[in-house]
C-alpha cells in the first residue's frame, strides 16, 4: 500500500514520529490510511455543514478498519461569486482543486480516498483528481438544500435572481423581492434546483462513483449521514478488492451518465465537466456524442429552473435509481457495469420504483422524445455551442434576430436592466470564454434579468462564456472557438442577423463568407484583462470549451 512509504521500516522512524505527533498509535500505523477530501468553509451554504458529513465518513472508515485523515480544499460559491470579478475564478478553481488534491495525496501517500464535495466546480475538480490519482475512491456529497417557500410557492435561488429583473421591469416590488431574498434559501445544501451542483452530484451517482442516493438525499436529512458512514465503510471494500476509479468510469459508464443527464435536463456545465473528467481518465469524448445520446434519450424531468419541481421532489419520487430504471426499460442504460457499491448498475436498480410520475415522467410519456441538452454547430460555432433545450420556451426553439453585441457581461447586463434590449433581439456576449474572460464566467445575471422581465420568450442570449444551471430561456453558451481565439463570435457586428435552430442543431451568423473574411483581416483581439496572478497563468494554459476547458497534457 502507498502508506508503507511513510510508515514502514527503520528509515521511516522520523515519519512515524510526526504521525505520532498527530496522536496516531502503533496499532493505527498498521492500518490503511484513508484521505477524506472535503471543501468545508463558512462562506459557502452548500459546504457549511460538510464537517458533520465528514465526521460520519470518518466513523465509517474507522468501523471498517481504516484510519481517516481530513484533507480540505478550496471551494467557490458560484451564487456569491456571480456578476463580478469573482466569477472569473470559479471554473479556474476546478483545476486548482484537482491539482491541490494531487499534491496532498502524493505528498502523504494515502491508500484510498473519500471525496466529500457539494457545489459546482468542487465536484468535477475532485472527479478529475480521482481519475488522475486512480486510487480506490468513493464520493459522497453534502446533498441538496430544501426548497424555500414564498406565499405558498416552492422557490429557490433562481427565483431571487429573476426577481431582480422583475423589479427592473416593474413587475415586482422591492418588498416582494426582499421576501424572496429572506426565504428562498432556507439552510445548508447545494441550491435546490437542477443547477450545476446537483446535476454533477446526480451524475456522479449515475456513472457509478457514488452510492445510490448521493444526488438527491437532502442535506439536512439523517439519511445523508447514514450514506456518509456507509461510504466510509465502502471505501475499505474498494481498497481490499483493488477497485479503482478508472475501473468504474469507462466509456460505457460515461454513456450512462449522459443518458441520465438528458433525462434530467441537467445544467449545460455538465458537458464541460464530463469532457474534462473523461479527458483525465483517458475516455474518448466529443460534442457529437452528446447529440447522439440526446437523440435517443427522452427528457423525463423538468426540475427548476425548467419546471416547478425541486430536488426534494426528485428524492421522494425515487431519485436517480428511479430515473435510470425508467431509461433501462428501453435499453438506454448499461446494467452490467461496476459501481462503488460493489454491485452492478442493474443490481442497484433492482428495487428502484418511480413513486411520482409527475416528477419523473414514465418512459412512454416523456416531456420530449429527445434529451434536455443539445449541441449546436454552424457558422457562428464551428466547434460547437451548448443549450439546455428543455429550459427553452417552444417559441424560441427557432429564432432569427438582430445581434446586440457586448464585449463583457457587465455591459450586457446594464443594457438589459435599462430597457435597451427589445423583443426579437439576440444578445451576444463575447470575450468571456476560458481565455478571453479569463475564466469563462456564468451569465446568470443577464439571463435571469431577461426571464424576470418576461423577455425569455422573445430574446436569445449567445456567449462564449457559460451559464449557471439556474439559467432558463434561449441561452446558448460555450461558443467555440471563443472570441479571444478569433472565433466567428468576435466578428459579429451590431445588427447582424443570427439564426438559431435548436431542433436542427444549428447556430448560424447570416453574413457572407467574403464579408467575414474581410472582418477577420481587420480583427484586433483585446489585450488580456488580467496580467498577473493565478488567472494570468490559467489563461496561458486553458484549452477551448469544446475540449472541456482543461489543461492539455
From Swiss-Prot:
Pathway it works in: Amino-acid biosynthesis; L-isoleucine biosynthesis; L-isoleucine from 2-oxobutanoate: step 3/4; Amino-acid biosynthesis; L-valine biosynthesis; L-valine from pyruvate: step 3/4
Annotated positions binding Mg(2+): 78, 120-121, 442
Reaction catalysed by this enzyme: (2R)-2,3-dihydroxy-3-methylbutanoate = 3-methyl-2-oxobutanoate + H2O; (2R,3R)-2,3-dihydroxy-3-methylpentanoate = (S)-3-methyl-2-oxopentanoate + H2O
Residue positions, PTM N6-carboxylysine: 121
Keywords recorded for this protein, A-Z: 2Fe-2S, Amino-acid biosynthesis, Branched-chain amino acid biosynthesis, Iron, Iron-sulfur, Lyase, Magnesium, Metal-binding
GO annotation, cellular component aspect: cytosol
Cofactor, how bound (note): Binds 1 [2Fe-2S] cluster per subunit. This cluster acts as a Lewis acid cofactor.
Enzyme class: lyase
GO-annotated biological processes: isoleucine biosynthetic process; L-valine biosynthetic process
Any one Gene Ontology molecular-function term assigned to this protein's record: dihydroxy-acid dehydratase activity
UniProt-listed PROSITE patterns: ILVD_EDD_1, ILVD_EDD_2
Residues at the catalytic site: 468
EC number of the protein: 4.2.1.9
Top-level lineage group: Bacteria
InterPro entries hit by this protein: Dihydro-acid_dehy_C, DihydroxyA_deHydtase, DiOHA_6PGluconate_deHydtase_CS, ILV_EDD_C, ILV_EDD_N, IlvD/EDD_N
Family in the record: Belongs to the IlvD/Edd family.
Subunit structure: Homodimer.
Function summary: Functions in the biosynthesis of branched-chain amino acids. Catalyzes the dehydration of (2R,3R)-2,3-dihydroxy-3-methylpentanoate (2,3-dihydroxy-3-methylvalerate) into 2-oxo-3-methylpentanoate (2-oxo-3-methylvalerate) and of (2R)-2,3-dihydroxy-3-methylbutanoate (2,3-dihydroxyisovalerate) into 2-oxo-3-methylbutanoate (2-oxoisovalerate), the penultimate precursor to L-isoleucine and L-valine, respectively.
Protein name according to UniProt: Dihydroxy-acid dehydratase
Species annotation: Carboxydothermus hydrogenoformans (strain ATCC BAA-161 / DSM 6008 / Z-2901)
